[in-house]
């Protein structure tokens, strides 16, 4: 499921591929570095802004490439300073990118830790019953250029807040590939995008600060382990037994815990880095003390960090988050055995921040407006 645009996005080109295209038209190799410097370091918003390029070359670039394949159509900020960016692609598809700010321990309310969460697909085919992203199914994969464009749009937004100087992407602490879609189901585009994100000629963001999340595609986890850049891994677990996990995550039928956990352990041992286990707490589904004990045992075996996430309500779904008391009781089971655990507090609960929810809400509003015009 791919979209073929009239012009490919420049944000999907590597230094090598762009150099090859330029050489085909007789341009010197250094032009590729100049162009990418304009895109990622100087953040030119138009071809005419690339003033050290000859005009014929700028005309060719305009005819050949799409400089920015994503347009910001909505920016919602929550009371806890979580920003959700809704982006429109060339075919009208909508995707979400989230900026999460949180205070560091010991520095009060200075929101100094910043994370960007990016999407890899329009919709999702995994069918997790609690998730807004997959309610309308999978529409298509994102191209590498569309994935990278999300980071540039974040840069544009941050630049606008500090107009005296360009914001460095390195000022963000982490980039997590945990937005709409299953990242490892769009593997080739993902790796190309992360290569561009990491490269010195690209956005220059360290691989150790990039986390790829998956619902559990075992063959792709093992493939990711062989990637030379060494990205971090997070597993969307959400159930500590097959019985619970299969009820809410269909992927568990193909890759049950007996297959998933050894693959995760192999990844961890190869890279020597702590894995993160993502666990959305859903009232009456996976928030029992028995689930907490099973999760504790899994985390201890994998030497993993556990990220507990109270469920963000999704319109049209009956699931809800447990009480704060129940959340703390669950976390205490892990803490008692010194499992590294984070219990996430409000992060965008007031701005449709459940993954994919803002997109669905906007699409419904567009459909209503379109129907009203007919």
From Swiss-Prot:
Highest taxon above the source species: Bacteria
Positions contributing to S-adenosyl-L-methionine binding: 181-182, 213, 236-238, 312
Annotated active site: 96 (proton acceptor), 355 (s-methylcysteine intermediate)
Enzyme class, first EC level, given as a word: transferase
Domain Radical SAM core span(s) in chain numbering: 110-350
Subcellular location as annotated: Cytoplasm
SUPFAM superfamilies: Radical SAM enzymes
UniProt: [4Fe-4S] cluster binding residues: 124, 128, 131
Family (UniProt): Belongs to the radical SAM superfamily. RlmN family.
Leftover remarks: Reaction proceeds by a ping-pong mechanism involving intermediate methylation of a conserved cysteine residue.
Name of the protein in its database record: Probable dual-specificity RNA methyltransferase RlmN 3
Source organism phylogeny: Bacteria, Pseudomonadati, Verrucomicrobiota, Opitutia, Opitutales
GN (gene name): rlmN3
